[in-house]
Amino acid sequence: MIGGSYVVAFVFLLTTLDRTQAFAAKPQPIDPSGWPGTFPAKDHCSKCGLCETTFVSHVTDACAFLNDGMARNIDGLEAKVHGRRRNQDLVWSGDSQPNNGVAEEGRFGVMTRPMQLAKGKNVDGAQWTGVVTGIAVSMLESGMVDAVVCIANNDDGNTDNWSSPQPILARSVDQVLRGRRVKPALAPSLAVLDELKDSTDIKKLLFCGVGCAVQAFRAIQHELQLDEVFVLGTNCADNSPTPAAAKQFLSQSFKDKLDGKRVRGYEFMQDFKVHVKYDDGTEQSQPSYERLPYFSLQGDVAEFAIAKSCLACFDYTNSLADVVVGYMGAPLDSSSMDSSFQTITVRNKMGERMVNCAIESDRLQVGQDASGSGSHEKFATVTLSSDNIVQKMVGGEMKSEGMPRLLGELMATLMTAAGPKGVNFARYSIDYHILRNYLHVLDIWGENDANNMIPAYSLEIVKKYLDTDEAFKALAEKIKSKR
């Protein structure tokens, strides 16, 4: 009996050790309360949610902001996802091509058809017309997917919660509808990965997200053992690091004009103004808008209102999504987001199926090809040179106050009349953000690391401006001389 007790005790000890070792070997999610300091990318972490799951073990191969992240992800996965790499040819204002007002793959990514204008249909309560929501609802209703990963607005009617992003694994239309409207702060889309992997009833999935989250998702999607995966992306630039920062941006920029109002979202629009959509908080209230010219914003708003990860991003156009929805390439033909066109980019056969499903379900209207006019390059470099973020990098003059409102309105009117429009406005926005972000990564990590982390298409744009624009070249040289 004594010998038997020893055997039992020994077996128990071995079993306990095995469990302890197994627990120790299992990747441990990072506590989100320590963000960003305890996360691998530190200040440049985009809070995509990957590290908040057991998939954290894949972070060095998936994160868009570690090592050569965006170059590794976009250049390395584009052909795998879409069947081919993009045509790298870029369109410039001086080119003689007759189609220089049509979106090219060099900037906008792989396309199976030209970028088109689109509106959502039969989607109430959207920030725009419901293009993204309409596609997602159609796919779920038709049985094309079993679930949708999206970011819900943690909105209980309280005006303080309007910008709080909450990732959900939506299995019903009502749950998908919680994802309506843009969330202006970093959102951990991938935080539901463990729930997804444990859900044996989900075999076909739609993942909705911005570029950095889509990149990380594409890097690990093979681990999920799903039969079909669809990815619906949005264009994205300059998110706030937290909901509090987004609210601070509005309160500081618009003073008391939004007091007591329920904000439904805001966008930096093609008329060089920030448009804030709001209502009075009642169930039947209709949306109204408050607008402020970019030029009248206080100079220090970028310091707290733009996440550091967004300053190191080169995936404005969401290169690895099957379908991408945005608005910068659309004409500003309405004073209301509720009736304005957006753009839709279809990248592959999966994307064609997604769009066709939404059209057949009468939740999507696709119109003519997106087009544009006007020169964009000089607008990009002039914007860059006057940017407080850039001036801080080069030790230049920092503006603390924006223009007086009337002068700002005049400037916005002139810029809208004289500046690039449609697709060419999108080119302006893409180039400006790529150039600014190149200067940022050059300043933080140096020339060699910067060149290694920037995807090929962005590097081509940077090289073009370095070769042709003396002002941009001078900014880059000033930053290089600091090291």
Task: Annotate each predicted stretch with a short phrase.
Residues 126-131, 155, 207-217, 238-240:
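Gly/Ser/Thr-rich loops at beta-strand to alpha-helix junctions
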